[in-house]
Curated annotation (Swiss-Prot):
The UBP-type zinc finger binds 3 zinc ions. However, it does not bind ubiquitin, probably because the conserved Arg in position 55 is replaced by a Glu residue. GO terms for biological process: axon guidance; cell migration; centrosome duplication; endocytosis; protein deubiquitination; protein K48-linked deubiquitination; protein K63-linked deubiquitination; proteolysis. The gene is usp33. Zn(2+) 1 binds at C8, H10, C83, C86. The lineage of its organism: Eukaryota, Metazoa, Chordata, Craniata, Vertebrata. It comes from Xenopus tropicalis (Western clawed frog). This is Ubiquitin carboxyl-terminal hydrolase 33.
Amino acid sequence: MSSLVCDCPHLESVGEVTKEELIKKSHGSCQDCRVRGPNLWACLENGCSYVGCGESHVDHSTLHSQDTKHCLTVNLTTLRVWCYTCSKEVFLDRKLSTQPTSAKLQDSHTQESKMSSSLTLKIPAAVVSENLDIELEEEDELKTRGLTGLKNIGNTCYMNAALQALSNCPPLTHYFLDCGGLARTDKKPALCKSYQKLMSDIWHKNRPGFVIPTNLFQGIKSVNPTFRGYSQQDAQEFLRCLMDVLHEELKEQIVEVEEDAQTGIVEENLDEDKSQSDNDFHSCDSGSSSDHAESESRKLSEELTESTMLIHEDQKDVESCKTWQKEKKFSNNLNQNHFLQDFEKNIQSTIEESECLKQETVKVQIQSKAADFTAEVNMNDLPTSQTPLLNEGATTHLSSSPPKPGAVWTGHKKVPGLCPAKKRKQKKYHSVIADIFDGTIVSSVQCLTCDRVSVTLETFQDLSLPIPGKEDLAKLHSSSHQSSLVKAGSCGEAYAPQGWIAFFLEYFKSWFWGPTVTLQDCLAAFFARDELKGDNMYSCEKCKKLRNGVKFCKVQKFPEILCIHLKRFRHELMFSTKIGTHVSFPLEGLDLQPFLAKDSPSQIVTYDLLSVICHHGTASSGHYIAYCRNNLNNLWYEFDDQSVTEVSEATVQNAEAYVLFYRKASEEAQKERRRVSCLLNIMEPSLLQFYISRQWLNKFKTFAEPGPISNNDFLCIHGGVPPRKASFIEDLVVMLPQNIWDYLYSRYGGGPAVNHLYVCYTCQTEMEKIEKRRKMELETFIRLNKAFQEEESPAVIYCISMQWFREWEGFVKSKDSDPPGPIDNTKIAAAKCGHITLRQGADSGQISEETWLFLQSIYGGGPEITLRQNVTLAESEGGHAEEKIDVETRNI
């Protein structure tokens, strides 16, 4: 940063410019491509009024400088000045410092923080009004945005319909349009970049008639071979694949630390919160049964060590951040003894118990209608002094992905300074996908023999609902069934208001014209109490036998956008069929209160329809279209590939829905945004300016329930800016005047409050140390492995788990930020005649004794598995997965 102290000789060419003029220009657009801000650049050459876009678009500002030889340009979002000729940042106030300044300028300089050797940021408070009011002020100007078709590039109607449905989900689209600087990834195929470009094209002011989503389609095909070729694909499967990839590319580690020792113990027992989005997305019917041969605790311990990498936290850092982690906790924590007493009274209180699980940040993947559950509780033996749910605790991970080895070998050496032996924790992630689409369901099963209740918290991204037939509808609508459901605390309330007259009218109508199926019917069928008997008996962990049971579930947390998938396709062994039953659905006011768990933190349970994907044709062939409500003019449009046509609400309601997107409806959220806009208009000068997360600000603009303010997406655990984010910090934050910050903080809580940005020296030092460690380990391994490759007949060969080695390789190649845990050979080891040998077909590699001792001295772990010269050939090869690790370890 030393170059910043040097004056730029080109400052003399700057014309007379005022802050008000720059702010006025920031509301404009690029003079060449008409793209709007943020991050437009204005030329400062005397007499030149050019405004152009930056690198996030076509970079017309740079082209203008090259054509005109104008040197200086100013970013209209941050008011930072760049000289193209000097290739450095310069400061206008250096040029003006010798001139007398007015009181107004002095006040302005007082309000703005100075740039020092550590990073500080200049963001004018007036820009915030543009960031907050885009939906309110620009509605008339932008009313034609979003009506762009997508060209069919080879039987891709399924993709086009899905993309149009997502495009008309304001929280997601505004993220990519307003927070484009957050869409950063080093992962291939960088689908988030392709999606961001596509959204920019679709919602451009000067939109074309249609665009061709070639880049995004190529990216999807590269990660999922299912979508290669030209056969018909499923729009719902495409949605899951796309959002899963977007999550993986955009996910950020959540900065979480222990509040105290007791909390730390509980978190060690419970493991860390992990969004379902960290794995493949699954709907609520995508679970599978588990094998009960092993104990629940063993399965859980293996799952707790799964996934990306294990994080290693410094205890001092943990203690230093206790206070602002407390601010992040929701204020709805319940007293455990209170709901243990309620739990003994009726089955419904098991949902309250699951709330305790939620507060300990336990999230698991969904398994609908499966007979495997966690957190077993005996209703007759519940003590009041503890919570068995927390002690048993656990999470269940159900995925179609192959199981990953994860158990940590604990018998390793401790090497101070290199690999502390304390228990490592899983990383916790979130992304814009998880923030918008993730919800939570509480599933409970009661054994009718011993009264033990099993409770599971399950995270879902979409609800896959069955379409009930005539007999199912009769059962759902029957008065007797209503009573049993209401008593059981299930979803019978959805039908409770229906009287006998209405019931008979509905019955006779269905007799002549067939049953009328509503979306509420599908929801009621999904959440209805399920009797587990006959071939579907419940395997009780306490009884150790198959028993009759009762299962029911409710929603603990509703997502901001609820994706509902109607199961229209049935795939049999030899053929597939499609259910063509019309399902009526509301355009506004979908009330989900009957399906909400007791004491759920969700305040808003009413949803309005955003978009619906429809399929015309049969199970083997057909065509997808989408009906979407434009958020700017509230009109409905049909998106049929590159054709976009306005339609009536009646046309939408008569559609054969396949996938529906509902958004939380909240007048209060709109009032809050208007209040903040009014505060901006009456803004008073303040001595302090506060920085707020641009990502949270997007939630405030588009979410019905934005939740507490979270500034941790641009801060490290020490309260500074992580070095890797320093170069683009202006994309992560917005500056607020004090009165706006005070209002938002008092209304939503959270934090921490930030009025000064600086690069964290501690993180910088740690980063330099970790780079030295990477270099040392990598160079040593290459040297030792090269000697091993040159050795003709080694006396002993050591085996190492390739799963662990890949994690280590990712660390030394800087693909992963944290080192792996202890060496874990448990998955490749087998006991034979009292000795540990290599398991047949194990995913293992071969290394020399020196290499093993080197890695083991740093990371510890085991067990030690060796191959000697006197073993048989078959035993030494160990299976197809064994390999000698190449010296270059995949082109280092």
